[in-house]
């Protein structure tokens, strides 16, 4: 569960000192359509946020679509990759910063860890068990109950909603999560649904 670097979204690396992070991958054969599989990313984010909050006592929030934040800084990240072998699979990669006290200069203003935030010192094995339990629960609910329960829980944890943001070429105030998992922006010309991209916050809307 420890490595020097992992791979994050947009080809970035996940920096780690050995034993200082929980880095894990879960192989899933989704019981849902290919079109619905991006919602698994949101389910993973909710599961990680709940697990971290439960084990550390920290006030954890979500940045669309799946960054896990504490006080606006990234504590955990998620990457999903699809593969087609005999049957389609999804590899769910999760990285949670636990014991880091410092980060590289490029990350110092945006990254954090459980230790830096003063959270309870959860062990990696303990957190792994709680993450897997929460992930299995939310994946099962998504497959059996549809998106509505997950959407409600994601919105309850969302840090992005209400903020003025830029996502790619789109700028506006994030106001909702659509039924397909897209981020809904309020712009001068109306509502814009954004399905992919990195959220860059500008100010509170």
Predicted segment positions?
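N-terminal lobe of the biotin/lipoate ligase/transferase fold
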Residues: 1-54, 204
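General beta-strand structural signal in soluble alpha/beta enzymes
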Residues: 60-64
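Long, positively charged amphipathic alpha-helical accessory segments at protein N-termini or as interdomain linkers
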Residues: 38, 42-59, 70-205
């Amino acid at each position: 569960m420890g490595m020097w670097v992992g791979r994050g979204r947009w080809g970035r690396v996940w920096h780690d000192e050995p034993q200082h992070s929980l880095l894990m991958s879960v192989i899933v054969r989704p019981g849902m359509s290919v079109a619905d599989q991006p919602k698994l990313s949101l389910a993973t984010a909710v599961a990680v946020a709940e697990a971290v909050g439960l084990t550390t006592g920290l006030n954890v929030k979500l940045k669309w679509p799946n960054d896990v934040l504490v006080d606006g800084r990234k504590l955990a990240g998620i990457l999903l990759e699809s593969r087609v072998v005999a049957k389609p699979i999804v590899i769910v990669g999760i990285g949670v910063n636990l014991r880091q006290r410092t980060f590289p200069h490029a990350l110092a203003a945006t990254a954090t860890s459980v230790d830096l935030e003063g959270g309870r010192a959860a062990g990696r094995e303990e957190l792994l068990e709680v993450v897997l339990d929460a992930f299995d629960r939310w994946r099962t609910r998504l497959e059996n109950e549809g998106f509505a329960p997950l959407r409600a829980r994601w919105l309850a944890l969302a840090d992005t909603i209400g903020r003025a943001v830029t996502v790619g070429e789109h700028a506006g105030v994030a106001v909702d999560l659509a039924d397909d998992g897209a981020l809904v922006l309020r712009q001068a010309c109306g509502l814009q649904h954004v399905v992919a991209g990195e959220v860059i916050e500008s100010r509170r809307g």
